[in-house]
Amino acid sequence: MRPKILTALVAGFFAICVSATSADAKPLKVFILAGQSNMEGHAAISTFDYIGKDPLTAPLLKEMRNPDGTPRVCDKVWMSYLTGPYDGSANGEGLGKLTAGFGERGNQPTKIGGKIGPEFTFGIYMEKELKEPILIIKTAWGGRSLNTEFRPPSAGQYRLPKEIQELWDKYPQGAHGVPKLEDRKKWRDDKDAASGVFYRMMIDHVKKVLLNPKRVCPEYDEQAGFELAGFVWLQGFNDLVDGTTYPGPDQPRKYDEYSRLLAHFIRDVRKDLSAPKMPFVIGVLGVDGEKNVNFRKAMAAPADMPEFKGNVIAVDTAPFWDHAIAAAMPKQGEYNNIVSTAHTLKADGTFDRDWKWEKYWKPVGNPLPQERTWRFMTIDPTEKKDKLEKYDARRFRDITLPAGMEKWYMPDFDDRTWTEGKAPIGKGVWKHSGITLDKFPSKWGEGEFLLMRTTFEIEDLNCESYRIAVLARQGFHVYLNGQKIHTYIWWQDKPQYGSIVLGKEQIKHLKKGENVLAVYANDQYDLNSPEHYAAIDVRIEGITKADQEKLDLALEEVLSPKDREALKGSSNGGYHYFGSAKIFAQMGKAFAEALLPLQK
């Protein structure tokens, strides 16, 4: 009898333990984060250090990093992140414990990335304050509006505002921003087809995750269940700039429709998820800081509606706008334009020798670039795979060369039968930005592609840095002494010489004595002017250490050391809060702090 008694005692003990464990278990806290590109998050991990430079935000950085400087991993917070390209055509789900990398992921939605959104510090501070395990379900796509793609079901069909409908009625033939009468049915059909698509994707994904939370969160206790503990909405930019849905000058009532739509959105989300009192945070768009007052007020307005009092909270993100980065950004544009330009041209296409930044870099080698003889030939693609069937702005591509031409860029290639001439080599008229380039020392010829070679002598290599100065309408390959040192696949609208600073791997091919420079390029045409046109000139230039110091000092007038320090906190444009981790970290913390008092 004794073994049976012992077995019964052991079984009873485990039953008591399991019962006690289940009684102590707490429901899984589920938070939903949704919106467009700023909810995705474009803050590069590389901007983390900037957070620590400000005494007010330095404590945030300590929460975000391990002692060794790596991003923290939250042991009690799990992520299900539905995202993908802006059109939703290739969605994927990112899973795992919360860490840095659940921001924007481009076309690899299932892979951990190099960016964060507000979810990182949101989860960190929720984990810090809550005892329960936490699941964050995040759904976000760039470029999606509340008036169309996230349109809630109860808002009804999209209707043109009265002012816009009257404008359309006035111009049946169409006008700027006004479709022709015969195209309007398709416009409306497309609008109806797009309406609510991303709202449904969001709801469907949340329901899918909640059908089996253990798939995402291994610590989920089925007996304890889960609690829909809060929803955070961070969106707005596409509505802010939508002049069709919100017409007229910026004034207090301009964005009333957004307030109406957002109220419907809150009601519908709660209804569709069977969570009538689920706490809801509106992340009020703070792009441009305290500007866009009327839109920000419209966004926050639902929080003041009687039906939402106490469980809908508007969190203004404008206070997190970084004014130091904002001040430096325009200067960075000017700075980048200067350092990426080798030489500017005057209206007639000749060199602008009076340009302030012209004097620091000097041509390398003899004879001087303008005196060098190039040998060149043009060819057309002959194989079907190399021909463009339709217009493409990016025309540059590699084609199959005639037999015997495969190594045309090598120093020992025999180019004696090629045409000779000075550069730039060109054809047609390249006209843009008030500059007309139509006079060329050498004519390109009829072929689309150009192969060109020249030689120059170098006596010494005593420059601090070297660069390629290149004039080209389309893309190009540049070879130095038989080695490819640069490829550019896009195009250049403005006629000017671009500056491409060479690294060690490229400079090592530059030598004392004779050097062979070879270039592969192609021409351009556009739909309005099918005549082909082109221009190409390439030269290697150097800058001495003394001139580099002078240039750096002069450039500080454009972009000061203080500005450069601020820009270390930026990795994207202003519409993405500069891709600044400092801004997104503060937002995530603020969203968590808004929801915490509403937790049961």
What function would you assign to each model-found segment?
Residues 7-17:
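Bacterial N-terminal signal peptides
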Residues 1-5:
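Positively charged n-region of N-terminal signal peptides that target proteins for export
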Residues 480-503:
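Solvent-exposed beta-strand/loop surfaces of large extracellular or lumenal domains
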